[in-house]
Each structure stands twice: as structure tokens, then as C-alpha cells.
Design a protein with these regions (language model features):
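C-terminal-biased regions
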Residues: 1-23, 27-122
Length: 122
């Protein structure tokens, strides 16, 4: 199974990988919120830190030749700040604020990927 999973990741398009990363950020944030609700601070810490690591990866892999990269870098920085605040304060509000923004950004990337694929068949 591990070999299959590795192979499927290796054959993904850049758009597929970004989509997968956003899905994992959203998943980890939701799990972190559930852990917070259950006063499982160790669990919420682990989930929030993983989400931050993925957001940091998304930020460090931006292609800065495009104008939009600066705005995305600022957004990613804000997402990580809010996740950190939720983790430090043991409060769901900062994550609840950015979760819809992250979901919307994921959808925007997904739509852009579909348009690129339609414009470049094969």
C-alpha cells in the first residue's frame, strides 16, 4: 500500500498535489478543532502544528515570478499566525476565521487547475 501511495503521489500533477495539501490542511484544522473541543490540547497541538507545516510548505514553494505570489505569501503568513493563536490560546475562533478562507482558496486553485487542463489537453 505504501508503495502504491508513493507512486500515486509521484504521478500527480502540480494541481493535484496542491489540492491534496489543502485537503490535508483543512482536515488537520478540523481535527484540531475537535481536539480543542474535547480539551485534548496535546492532540490539537499536533494537528495545528501539522497544518502549519503544510501551510509553510505551500508558502516556500511559491513561484515569485508571478504577481499573485506576494498576496498568497501574505495569506499563508496570516493563516499560520491564526493557527498559532488558536494553539497558544486554546481557542477555536482564530482557526474558525481562516478555515473558510482556506477552503475558498483551495476551490480557487482547483478551478484554476481545471482551466489549465482544459486549455492544455493531453
Amino acid at each position: 500500500y505504501a508503495r502504491y501511495k508513493e507512486q500515486s503521489v509521484m504521478t500527480m500533477t502540480q494541481g493535484d498535489l496542491i489540492n491534496l495539501l489543502f485537503d490535508e490542511v483543512i482536515n488537520r484544522l478540523n481535527k484540531g478543532l475537535v481536539s480543542l473541543e474535547q480539551n485534548d490540547y496535546e492532540g490539537s497541538n499536533a494537528h495545528f502544528k501539522k497544518a502549519q507545516a503544510i501551510v509553510t510548505h505551500l508558502s516556500t514553494t511559491l513561484d515569485h515570478q508571478y504577481e499573485v505570489s506576494g498576496g498568497l505569501a501574505s495569506l499563508y503568513e496570516y493563516f499560520n499566525y491564526q493557527i498559532l493563536q488558536a494553539n497558544i490560546k486554546k481557542s477555536p475562533e482564530p482557526v474558525e476565521e481562516v478555515l473558510p478562507m482556506i477552503t475558498e482558496l483551495k476551490e480557487a486553485f482547483s478551478q484554476a487547475d481545471k482551466q489549465v487542463r482544459m486549455g492544455h489537453p493531453g
